[in-house]
Amino acid sequence: MRVLIKNGIVVNADGQAKQDLLIESGIVRQLGTDISPQLPCEEIDASGCYVFPGGVDVHTHFNIDVGIARSCDDFFTGTRAAACGGTTTIIDHMGFGPNGCRLRHQLEVYRGYAAHKAVIDYSFHGVIQHINHAILDEIPMMVEEGLSSFKLYLTYQYKLNDDEVLQALRRLHESGALTTVHPENDAAIASKRAEFIAAGLTAPRYHALSRPLECEAEAIARMINLAQIAGNAPLYIVHLSNGLGLDYLRLARANHQPVWVETCPQYLLLDERSYDTEDGMKFILSPPLRNVREQDKLWCGISDGAIDVVATDHCTFSMAQRQQISKGDFSRCPNGLPGVENRMQLLFSSGVMTGRISPERFVELTSAMPARLFGLWPQKGILAPGSDGDVVIIDPRQSQQIQHRHLHDNADYSPWEGFTCQGAIVRTLSRGETIFCDGTFTGKAGRGRFLRRKPFVPPVL
């Protein structure tokens, strides 16, 4: 199979040029002007469009069971939505397994979930839900099998204490793995939540008030210090929602600590006023939406390079699930928002088209740095000879209004309903195969491949 993309502006993290792109057998073979292939091929005219590396979303939750509910996107509907939004690779955060289970247990479960359903290429982050000698001894074997990142939680059912975190940080560092962490102070949250519930204050806005930004920022600072104590272990902070936490990360970077951070479109474009709407329960996620001032601080981090990655934390529960389970009580509502289909378009529209970031910085945030950090570079995250032919073509001249009825996930709403975006995703190619074109999904379940990722190598800070 040969595909020639002509007349587009090909953009990588280190530059852009108007040139053609030739893909053969799923691999980029040539970039240049006026490429004339010797053999017949499909030609795609990208005149006036940007040709970007396919998106790499390193934070999704497909088919996750959170105890009170199972998310409504599995690995088919979730990756279908990703493909239609220009994302060609996902790394899914596996959910918790049975109490006392080994690391391999969840890997086998999740490979079963994805094997015959994933539309695009995929991998998983390991999840460490308890610490003992067997778990610590298993980590190097998991890294050898291609899982080079693991998640720790400082809140929820399987939160780790500081001693357990230190043990995990040390062993992950020694084994060539990157530690990722959900940082919130669980004790402080529990205290605030109990206070509100006792007073009968259970409306959605009290979800945000029960998880103030200081709970997140304190946990970020604590993880930075613990990583330093653990031998300067590399650390990746997921779903940053506030500027104080970013300040702590800037300080760590100034002290040459190997720390990286992601944020998500919801923290850049939605704010806490959503909780006071009639459908406020559909915006319940953790950490919660913040105020506009915190948004501005995050945009500064996007613009100046302090934030490394924009992912989604896609975790979809329908409004029917939310209403039936919560019965109006924020503390009972399953947490998470859909968004895997909208990430690329939202950041392109609100970032590139407003002049906040360059097209090159867009690539850095959405594909290049995610691929570097998580052991996929240069197979993913770049359009260069030898890399996978994963491509998203965006037409900056088109304007689109987001409406859930046109999306491809399995939710029954979108938090982005009514948002108008400048720039439209017109085609997505995965390993040279068109899987989305002009509003129509053209891929198929099961074509996605499991990616064995390389051990962690820190990008230059």
Curated annotation (Swiss-Prot):
Reaction catalyzed: D-5-phenylhydantoin + H2O = N-carbamoyl-D-phenylglycine + H(+)
Residues where substrate binds: 156, 286, 335
Modification note: Carboxylation allows a single lysine to coordinate two divalent metal cations.
GO cellular component terms attached to this protein's record: cytosol
Keyword Metal-binding included in the entry's annotation: yes
Similarity-based family: Belongs to the metallo-dependent hydrolases superfamily. Hydantoinase/dihydropyrimidinase family.
Function: Catalyzes the stereospecific hydrolysis of the cyclic amide bond of D-hydantoin derivatives with an aromatic side chains at the 5'-position. Has no activity on dihydropyrimidines. The physiological function is unknown.
Subunit structure: Homotetramer.
Protein name: D-phenylhydantoinase
Organism (species): Escherichia coli O81 (strain ED1a)
Name of the gene: hyuA
